[in-house]
A protein has these predicted regions:
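Small-residue-rich helix-loop
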Residues: 59-61, 323-453
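Beta-lactamase-like hydrolase cores
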Residues: 23-54, 60-67, 132-136
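Short beta-strand scaffold segments in enzyme catalytic cores
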Residues: 48-50, 94-96, 433
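N-terminal signal peptide c-region/cleavage motif recognized by signal peptidases
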Residues: 17-21
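Short active-site loop at a secondary-structure junction
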Residues: 61-81
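Residue-level preference for non-acidic, small/hydrophobic
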Residues: 56, 75-82, 145, 177, ...
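Conserved serine DD-peptidase/penicillin-binding transpeptidase domain
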Residues: 28-36, 85-355
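Sec-dependent signal peptide recognition
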Residues: 5-13
């Protein structure tokens, strides 16, 4: 039986071949309805809108007003509003203060860091931040590391609540200070009859124990699924990795969402600082930044960089931080989920995009309750096309069979290289929205949402 993904591929092929564009207005092509029937997907669980960008009315509009879960296609909404409200050159800032005198490379006092939600503070960029601190004369810190997280006000959350996978990176929580997408990366290496585990960056205060059984299998299939990482006692900060690992896999890396963002930031900051010869004597404590100009203001790459990463690679954490940033910029800090939702609704309403069926939780689509209609998504795609920022919006989308999440999808199909599409997948949800260059030369906006087991 064909899957929803197979149906999507088939539908995109129909678009490019012109079968959809030549269909009678508002009708689903018969070949497409047959494909849905073969996949056992009822028509009332599907919403489709197709409209040439130069046309005033859709060619196809099926259940366009139905409120359906869009999965990661919701990222288009957050991205569209971000370009409108923040602008393509918006940058996040991370501010650092030295709360004491600096003499002969020693800070006699606390180092205070205030995060404003930069979602792309990778290890490489954290190293650059630390290099700026060294440029200000700091190599040794005789004080605490003080983290100011006050720009974000978030409810307590369970990273495993969504699907029972708390260590999966896609479940990483947002935060005012986030390092390396909240990923702790481990290197796995067969050594004799065991597996050695080494962290990518030194992890001060973290114990790693390998209980992995090395097998003699030469094939390397599903090795990640065969591993069972666990933190038996979060208070001890001990990571135990059990399971089995085929010798044929050789060296591999495993990235995990082990701790809440502030803890991961602390661990990685200390690890990088120590690796480059620095020392930090004190504890890590929460606190408030002083009301004075920072010693270092470290800026992120522009918003367009973040939009490319979060759309092409469907990065949930980046999108959730962006959603919160929208709220803070519109209504003032601290950022909250409610402010983010209000900011998104206000922008869409201002641009004539329907919000009647819109339900927002975190703006990323990693949600069981988020909803939007295919008609509203089509309105958004058309509004983006008319915007002076369309080039930035479209460039952030995966290209069929070319890059991002679509690099291995639509290969060998007529749509390969001729569509910019955002897809989304959850349990019982498949979704697709974007732009296709049809066979007759017209550009077409297309939305397809399927909510069915």
């Amino acid at each position: 039986m064909p899957s929803a993904r197979t149906v999507f591929r088939f539908f995109a092929g129909l678009l490019l071949a012109g079968h959809v564009v030549s269909a009678a207005a508002a009708e689903l092509p018969a070949v497409f309805t047959r494909a849905l029937k073969q996949a056992a997907i009822p028509l009332d669980h599907v919403a489709v809108v197709v409209q040439p960008l130069d046309a005033d009315a859709p060619l196809i509009s099926h259940h366009a007003d139905a409120a359906l879960n869009p999965a990661s296609v919701m990222k288009l909404v957050t991205s569209f509003v971000a370009l409108n409200q923040l602008g393509p050159n918006y940058v996040w800032k991370t501010d650092v203060w030295a709360d004491g005198p600096i003499r002969d490379g020693v800070l006699e006092g606390d180092l205070v860091i205030k995060g404003h939600g930069d979602p792309g503070l990778t290890l490489e960029r954290m190293w650059l931040l630390q290099r700026e601190l060294r440029g200000r004369g700091i190599r040794h810190i005789h004080g605490n590391l003080v983290l100011d997280l006050s720009d974000f006000e978030l409810p307590a959350s369970d990273p495993g609540a969504f699907d029972g996978e708390p260590l999966a990176l896609y479940n990483a929580a947002p935060g005012a200070l986030v390092a390396n997408f909240n990923a702790t990366t481990l290197r796995l290496k067969p050594a004799g009859h065991a597996i050695e585990i080494e962290p990518e960056v030194a992890l001060p205060g973290i114990t790693i124990r390998s209980d992995i059984a090395l097998t003699d299998d030469s094939a390397c299939n599903g090795w990640k699924d065969a591993l069972v990482p666990d933190i038996p006692d979060p208070g001890r900060k001990e990571l135990v990795v059990a399971g089995h690992y085929p010798r044929g896999c050789g060296d591999q890396t495993l990235s995990l969402n082990l701790f809440e963002p502030a803890v991961t930031f602390d661990i990685l900051f200390r690890g990088l600082w120590a690796e480059t010869g620095g020392t930090l004597d004190g504890q890590t404590v929460p606190g408030m930044a002083p009301d004075t100009p920072p010693l270092v203001r470290f800026e992120s790459p522009p918003l367009t960089n973040a939009l490319t990463l979060l759309n092409k690679y469907s990065n949930n954490l980046m999108t959730r931080n962006l959603f919160l940033t929208l709220g803070a910029e519109a209504y003032g800090a601290p950022a909250t989920l409610d402010k983010g939702a209000r900011a998104v609704r206000a922008d869409l309403t201002q641009r004539g995009i329907s919000t009647r069926k819109l339900v927002l939780e975190n703006g990323s689509g990693l949600s069981r309750i988020e909803r939007i209609s295919a008609g509203a998504l089509n309105q958004l795609l058309r509004a983006a096309y008319r915007s002076p920022l369309f080039a930035e919006f479209e460039a952030a989308l995966p290209i069929a069979a070319t890059d991002g999440t679509l690099k291995r999808r639509f290969r060998g199909s007529p749509v390969a290289g001729k569509a910019h599409l955002k897809t989304g997948t959850l349990r019982d949800v498949s979704a697709l929205a974007g732009y296709v260059d049809a066979a007759d030369g017209r550009r077409v906006s297309v939305v397809m949402l399927v909510n069915h087991p």
